[in-house]
Amino acid sequence: MNELQVKFNEKVKQDIMKNFGYKSPMQIPRIKKIVINMTAGNEVSNTKAVEEVINELTLITGQTPYKTHAKKSLASFKIREGMPMGGKVTLRRDKMWDFLQKLIDIVIPRIRDFRGISPKSFDGRGNFALGIEEEIIFPEIDFDKIRRNKGLDVIIVTSANTDSEAKYLLEKLGMPFAKATN
């Protein structure tokens, strides 16, 4: 079992149950899955760029991503319907906990000029989205092999009903949110 998963089971569950006044342990919000999405950006027409995205996502997550394709044709961006755009990975169970621990302990502290994660990135249903501008902050990515920074999206899907429950859960797991300024 991962350290973060042990922390969740031993400390965070009881803390959430006490703080929100849940009567049953089944009411406690949990992290269901983490979805990581990455696109080739301006280089979509270049098939090598899409393959680089797939390889980088495989290195970052330890799981083979599936290719995402364009839904519509856009002449201004030279994109045709069905053209490969990037990759997407859904992490669950142990790989999810391993990725979340790596994200909190290693990746987020390496973000340049980091002052905390904006707590405004919740969707109203207890899910959290985080945009990472540079994939080179992941320890698996070799800086010398990157032609261009692509960035990626990380979506943490929870079973929480409200944003406050999800934020409390992620804070207790160690997510460094920025303090609210007045």
From Swiss-Prot:
Family label: Belongs to the universal ribosomal protein uL5 family.
Keywords, ordered alphabetically: Ribonucleoprotein, Ribosomal protein, RNA-binding, rRNA-binding, tRNA-binding
Entry-linked Pfam families: Ribosomal_L5 (PF00281), Ribosomal_L5_C (PF00673)
Gene Ontology cellular component annotations, sorted alphabetically: ribonucleoprotein complex; ribosome
Key word Zinc present: no
GO molecular function: rRNA binding; structural constituent of ribosome; tRNA binding
Stated name of the protein: Large ribosomal subunit protein uL5
Biological role: This is one of the proteins that bind and probably mediate the attachment of the 5S RNA into the large ribosomal subunit, where it forms part of the central protuberance. In the 70S ribosome it contacts protein S13 of the 30S subunit (bridge B1b), connecting the 2 subunits; this bridge is implicated in subunit movement. Contacts the P site tRNA; the 5S rRNA and some of its associated proteins might help stabilize positioning of ribosome-bound tRNAs.
Assembly information from the UniProt record: Part of the 50S ribosomal subunit; part of the 5S rRNA/L5/L18/L25 subcomplex. Contacts the 5S rRNA and the P site tRNA. Forms a bridge to the 30S subunit in the 70S ribosome.
GO BP: translation
HAMAP family per UniProt: Ribosomal_uL5_B (MF_01333_B)
Presence of keyword tRNA-binding: yes
